[in-house]
UniProtKB/Swiss-Prot annotation:
Keywords: Amino-acid biosynthesis, Cytoplasm, One-carbon metabolism, Pyridoxal phosphate, Transferase. It catalyses: (6R)-5,10-methylene-5,6,7,8-tetrahydrofolate + glycine + H2O = (6S)-5,6,7,8-tetrahydrofolate + L-serine. Catalyzes the reversible interconversion of serine and glycine with tetrahydrofolate (THF) serving as the one-carbon carrier. This reaction serves as the major source of one-carbon groups required for the biosynthesis of purines, thymidylate, methionine, and other important biomolecules. Also exhibits THF-independent aldolase activity toward beta-hydroxyamino acids, producing glycine and aldehydes, via a retro-aldol mechanism. This is Serine hydroxymethyltransferase. It comes from Chromobacterium violaceum (strain ATCC 12472 / DSM 30191 / JCM 1249 / CCUG 213 / NBRC 12614 / NCIMB 9131 / NCTC 9757 / MK). PROSITE patterns: SHMT. Disulfide bonds: none annotated. Homodimer. It is found in: Cytoplasm. The modification N6-(pyridoxal phosphate)lysine is found at residue 229.
């Protein structure tokens, strides 16, 4: 029997101290990493529930274990809600991550050596879309599409390359592209060359759910996503597809790639999907766009080049070369100022991926805190002040105090 008062603090104070320190960091630091966000207490309550105790291999109504009648309800709620959210015919909510969701699609329709077209990683693509370092790049023949001289996706060149190479699959989506994808055009290109079309909307899913970014579901055979980032749920993945692919996707998630689903995480996904169906979620996403746009504008006014010249989403890249800084240096400097970003390659970056010439900035987390345009401008000016004065330790310390004071005005979790 477990005692009700057997807390982490009592049983494992060393671990409890590390958790408490991270909670304090999240409250005290301005979070600008585009892929990070804060989940609601309800999402965390579901993820920390006794559902973690239950094995449930299989799918609702078709399990390999007994005692699944209640987790069947949980998983079906998640399925029904995410289908409603994105207008999908079919959904699988079991993938443990976005990467595993992508792998399940690949295994459903591809054979080793098949040709796959994805966005160039150096132009903003994602590792799982064909990077040589990833399983996708090791198993398949990868051809890339990228950006033109205006740092916008070149759809005409994409079509030309697709006609020449005849890929079996074309992938839309990115991890560091600020503009909108033309999913309709990409779907047309895929049909023209006889390819499947998959969209990884991990970064944009919350905006899509709110109707503020193009919905790929009507145009794609498969749509994958994470459930955190802009969607503001737990860390995990989903797959949406046309109904004809249900059997193939289900069998490739389980048993090909995974065993038992994480029903406590699926419950947390169900909560997040319900949150995303509320009117307040659209208001939140509208503010995400406003905050990203005003930060990009402010940084441009302070002399920093914004890749692609603007943002049409929650994210944008900043080219640091004019400041004589690398992304690695800027990441460290801003961290000292209690502002968290990540170094990121820019198109045709002369630096290595571990150094980079840019940083990636996103607005989802600060918007969850309650920041609006005034605070976003203040944050952008703090960033610019640090980048303008990388050797001024006193200024960086003052900005750290200022950043923490701003955070305390907008706590993530009210006491």
């Amino acid at each position: 029997m477990f005692a009700a008062d057997q807390t982490i603090a009592k049983f494992d104070p060393e671990l409890a101290a590390a958790i408490a320190a991270e909670c304090q960091r999240q409250e005290d630091h301005i979070e600008l990493i585009a892929s990070e966000n804060y989940t609601s207490p309800a999402v965390m309550e579901a993820q920390g529930s006794q559902l973690t105790n239950k094995y449930a291999e299989g799918y609702p109504g078709k399990r390999f274990y007994g005692g699944c009648e209640h987790v069947d309800v949980v998983e079906q709620l998640a399925i029904d809600r995410v289908k409603q959210l994105f207008g999908a015919e079919y959904a699988n909510v079991q993938p443990h991550s976005g990467s595993q969701a992508n792998q399940a699609v690949y295994f459903s329709i591809l054979k080793p050596g098949d040709t796959v077209m994805g966005m160039n990683l150096g132009h903003g693509g994602h590792l799982t879309h064909g990077s040589p370092a990833n399983l996708s790049g090791k198993m398949f023949n990868i051809v890339a599409y990228g950006l033109n001289d205006k740092e916008e996706i070149d759809y005409d060149d994409m079509e030309r390359v697709a006609m020449e190479t005849k890929p079996k699959l074309i992938i839309g989506g990115a991890s560091a592209y600020a503009l909108r994808f033309d999913f309709e055009r990409m779907g047309q290109i895929a049909k023209k060359v006889g390819a499947y079309f998959m969209v990884d909307m991990a970064h944009y899913a919350g905006l899509v759910a709110a109707g503020l970014y193009p919905n790929p579901v009507p145009h794609a055979d498969f749509v994958t996503s994470t459930t955190h980032k802009t969607l503001r749920g737990p860390r995990g993945g989903i797959i949406l597809a046309k109904a004809e692919f249900e059997k193939s996707i289900n069998s490739n998630v389980f048993p090909t790639l995974q065993g038992g689903p994480l029903e406590h995480v699926i419950a947390a996904k169900a909560v997040a999907f319900k949150e995303a169906l509320q009117p307040a979620f659209k208001e939140y996403q509208q503010q995400v766009l406003k905050n990203a746009a005003i930060m990009a504008k402010t940084l441009a006014e302070r002399g920093l080049r914004i890749v692609s010249g603007r943002t049409e989403s929650h994210v944008f890249l900043v080219d640091l070369r004019a400041k004589g800084l690398t992304g690695k240096q800027a990441d460290a400097l801003l961290g000292r100022a209690h502002i968290t970003v990540n170094k990121n390659a820019i198109p045709n970056d002369p630096e290595t991926p571990f150094v980079t010439s840019g940083i990636r900035i996103g607005s989802p987390a600060i918007t969850t805190r309650g920041f609006k345009e005034a605070e976003a401008i203040e944050v952008a000016n703090m960033v610019a002040d640090v980048l303008d004065n990388p050797n001024d330790d006193a200024l960086i310390a003052r900005i750290a105090e200022k950043a923490t004071a701003l955070c305390h005005r907008f706590p993530v979790y009210a006491k």
